[in-house]
Amino acid sequence: MNQFIDIHPKVLDALRSGKPVVALESTIIAHGMPYPKNVETALNVEKIVEQNGAIPATIAIIDGRIKVGLNPNELTSLGKLSNVLKVSKRDIPYCVIKKYSGATTVSATILIADMVGIKVFATGGIGGVHKDAAATFDISRDLEEISEKQVAVVSAGAKAILDLDLTLEYLETKGVEVIGYKTSEFPAFFSNASGLNTTFQLDEASQIAQLMYTKWNMGLSGGIVVANPIPQNYAIDKDSLDKAISSAILSAKDNKITGKELTPYLLKMLHSNKDITSLESNIGLIYNNAKIAALIAVEFSKL
């Protein structure tokens, strides 16, 4: 294995024996939620993956070592620290040589999962094309990594703060299938009403696993996006959500928040908005994605 990577013994055993494994990102722990809710949520996500038959592998960088699978102490430490870097692909070598701790974004998690052979990854929502990207060129690295690596990404669509239409256009250009799990409408993270179509709809985890297997055994490159709608009891009314997002974006512009700081800032603004329950919704959709990802990983391990 890569000299810079430490794989948790349980994860390593699963990979060597062909057992199902689900990769999990760590940005949500360090930058997505306040402590202690972040640690509690991350531990519950791992539990949900296990309860549905797969081995969880939370990915992060701890003191310059890339970790695939965290122990509870490492996970708690990551949730408590205030100086944890937000690590995308370009930041990994810097974080390693400086022996820093870093929380991996969707793109970095996909990259590391692919390095060690994990084929399924659960997250809240993927990054994508930001609003006003025509002027700012702010497009998440997540989309490139999804298009290049053979990993299935289970998410509640793309984060609601993004331009969802352009995000889907970008994925289409890159040849990435967007599979709606039991839906033909692309979910909008906190809401299921985007008015946009997925590439295909599949209703069974086994069908998604078969599509992954077929695509990659045909020699086709790249991953797939499994768009899994937020459970209805956690969904936020679209009009209320749109107002909250507009307010958050305006605040970001006023405070000149850009680049890698933008998404955490916008999500923080949504979580603090008293008119919506975005933190509870975020947790609900992540739990749901972890369950579906585990079911897909189990089915894929049978092929």
Curated annotation (Swiss-Prot):
The entry lists its GO molecular-function terms as: hydrolase activity, acting on glycosyl bonds; metal ion binding; pseudouridylate synthase activity
- Annotated residues that bind substrate are located at 86, 106, 140-142
**Which cofactors go with this protein?**
Mn(2+)
Q: What is the E.C. number?
A: 4.2.1.70
Pfam families in the record:
Indigoidine_A (PF04227)
Query: Which GO CC terms are listed, alphabetically?
Result: cytoplasm
Catalysed reaction(s) here are: D-ribose 5-phosphate + uracil = psi-UMP + H2O
Gene3D superfamilies from the xrefs?
Answer: Indigoidine synthase domain
Active-site feature positions: 25, 159
Keywords of the record, alphabetical order, are: Glycosidase, Hydrolase, Lyase, Manganese, Metal-binding
Q: Which residues bind Mn(2+)?
A: 138
Query: Can you tell me where the transmembrane regions are?
Result: none
Q: How is the cofactor bound?
A: Binds 1 Mn(2+) ion per subunit.
Family, similarity comment: Belongs to the pseudouridine-5'-phosphate glycosidase family.
User: What role is this protein assigned?
Assistant: Catalyzes the reversible cleavage of pseudouridine 5'-phosphate (PsiMP) to ribose 5-phosphate and uracil. Functions biologically in the cleavage direction, as part of a pseudouridine degradation pathway.
Binding partners and assembly: Homotrimer.
> What protein name applies here?
Pseudouridine-5'-phosphate glycosidase
Name of the gene encoding the protein in the UniProt record: psuG
